[in-house]
């Protein structure tokens, strides 16, 4: 009996190692914690445009907006005018910090229960990932699709007077939507606080409207009794 239990333990351990090793690698450059002291541009997006299933996020240029790459398509959002935003698609852009991963296949899970804030997303992602053998010591991308009762997201704005779109005292603009259809693109890591997640959490999440007319950094969410779908990277 002891030998059987030992065999099962070793088998499970080896499976965990194999699973972790096969997850699509997450890359990051620059660091969120440096924003405010420097806005050095560390990556041109066109240098990674050859990845057909790229997912990624970071600020646009010197805090001129937000970048979200979804399945190899780069979305760029800016909000230079009070109450207004623009969303375009372009690879010829730069970012001071950026996180990305190339993911061609996903495992799909249903999320049960309400989501009332970004922390709830973090907890749901961690719980489902752990239950399905993911190693939470390794960073990974995720996405969530569905209809959401309410979503609030912001688009950062320039902090330096010499940068296009600068407005004194305004560091970002928030936009709120009800009954919003779309998807959240996110990255989970327990070891990159201040790099590509905030210091008080393990996730960095952007929201992209289904019709691609809005994109921004997720601040608030509310779902009540709706079925939403979580996608985690499939072993490759």
Spans of features found by a protein language model:
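N-terminal low-complexity or amphipathic/hydrophobic leaders
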Residues: 38-96
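Bacterial Sec-dependent N-terminal signal peptides
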Residues: 1-24
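Mid-length scaffold segments of soluble, non-membrane domains
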Residues: 114-173
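Start-of-domain marker
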Residues: 24-49, 205
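Short, hydrophobic/π-rich interface segment
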Residues: 159-211
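Extracellular structured ligand-interaction cores
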Residues: 64, 139, 202-204, 215
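Conserved mixed alpha/beta catalytic, RNA-binding, or beta-rich assembly cores of soluble enzyme
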Residues: 80-83, 87-132, 148
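C-terminal structured interaction module
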Residues: 206-236
């Amino acid at each position: 009996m002891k030998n059987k239990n030992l065999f099962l333990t070793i088998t499970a351990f080896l499976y965990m190692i194999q699973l972790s090793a096969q997850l699509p690698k997450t890359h990051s450059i620059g660091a969120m914690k440096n924003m405010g002291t420097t806005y050095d541009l560390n990556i041109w997006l066109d240098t990674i445009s050859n990845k057909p299933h790229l997912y990624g996020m970071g600020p646009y240029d010197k805090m001129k907006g937000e970048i979200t790459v979804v399945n190899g398509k780069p979305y760029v959002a800016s909000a230079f005018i009070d109450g207004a935003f623009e969303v375009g698609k372009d690879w010829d852009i730069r970012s001071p910090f950026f996180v990305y991963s190339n993911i061609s296949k996903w495992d799909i899970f249903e999320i049960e229960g309400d989501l009332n804030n970004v922390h709830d997303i973090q907890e749901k992602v961690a719980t489902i990932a752990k239950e399905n053998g993911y190693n939470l010591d390794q960073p990974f991308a995720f996405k969530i699709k569905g209809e959401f009762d309410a979503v609030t997201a912001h688009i950062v704005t320039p902090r330096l007077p010499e940068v296009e779109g600068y407005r004194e005292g305004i560091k970002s603009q928030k936009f709120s939507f009800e009954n919003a259809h779309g998807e959240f693109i996110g990255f989970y890591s327990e070891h990159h606080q201040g790099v590509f997640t905030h210091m008080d959490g393990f996730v960095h999440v952007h929201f992209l409207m289904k019709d691609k007319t809005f994109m921004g950094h997720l601040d608030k969410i509310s779902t009540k009794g709706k079925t939403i779908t979580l996608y985690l990277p499939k072993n490759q």
